[in-house]
A protein has these predicted regions:
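Low-complexity, Pro/Ser/Thr- and charge-rich linker/hinge segments at domain boundaries
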Residues: 21, 101-119
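Hydrophobic membrane-insertion alpha-helices, especially the h-region
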Residues: 8-27
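Extracellular fibronectin type III
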Residues: 92-104
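Surface-exposed, short loops/turns at beta-strand junctions within beta-sandwich domains
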Residues: 77-86, 148-156
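Predominantly extracellular/luminal cell-surface or secreted proteins
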Residues: 55-61, 130-134
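Short coil/turn motif common to extracellular beta-sandwich-like domains
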Residues: 30, 34-50, 111-124
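Short beta-strand segments within Ig-like beta-sandwich modules, predominantly Fibronectin type-III
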Residues: 65-72, 139-143
Length: 161
């Protein structure tokens, strides 16, 4: 009779311990708020909002062989180049691996300036700009992201560097 009573007490203790352990595991898992998994954008500055984690690992390969590590702080913004990235939050436990894709955006803005044009790269990737007069190629210039070049011509083509 005593053995059955002790067995019941042991069973209750095991069940309570398992419930507490499962709750603790859920409590220490990193909580990823943003960005969403499989997020795609052409913006290069990404806002990471993560709770219950100490660090963020970002890599361009799924094995995380050469990750960049960032200390997590409220409103962490990271500037990334176009490409596909894998990332995870690390605390007591690790979050699941998520993906993030930054698409290349080619975008030239022209401003007429007297006899010339100012060509501004408002995309997110460096460009080679071919300048034409009619059908003749007259100049090639390199324009970095946010940079501007003064050119003379009547046709302009942005090409990936």
């Amino acid at each position: 009779m005593k053995n059955k009573h002790i067995l019941k007490i042991d069973l209750v203790l095991v069940v309570v311990s398992l419930v507490v352990l499962m709750g603790a595991v859920g409590y220490v898992n990193p909580l990823v708020i943003s960005p969403l998994d499989d997020y795609e954008t052409s913006e290069t500055e990404i806002l990471f909002s993560i709770e219950k984690a100490d660090a963020l690992l970002i890599d361009d390969n799924l094995d995380f062989t050469t990750p960049d590590e960032y200390s997590l702080e409220d409103g962490l913004r990271i500037d990334l180049k176009p490409g596909k990235y894998y990332w995870k939050a690390v605390g007591i436990l690790e979050s699941e691996i998520r993906t993030l894709t930054i698409n290349s955006e080619i975008n030239l803005e022209l401003k007429f300036n007297g006899n010339n044009y100012n060509v501004m790269n408002v995309g997110n990737i460096k460009l080679n700009v071919d300048v034409y007069n009619g059908t003749d190629l007259v100049e090639k210039v390199k324009v970095g992201v946010g940079d501007e070049a003064k050119v003379s011509g009547d046709g302009f083509v942005g090409v990936l560097e």
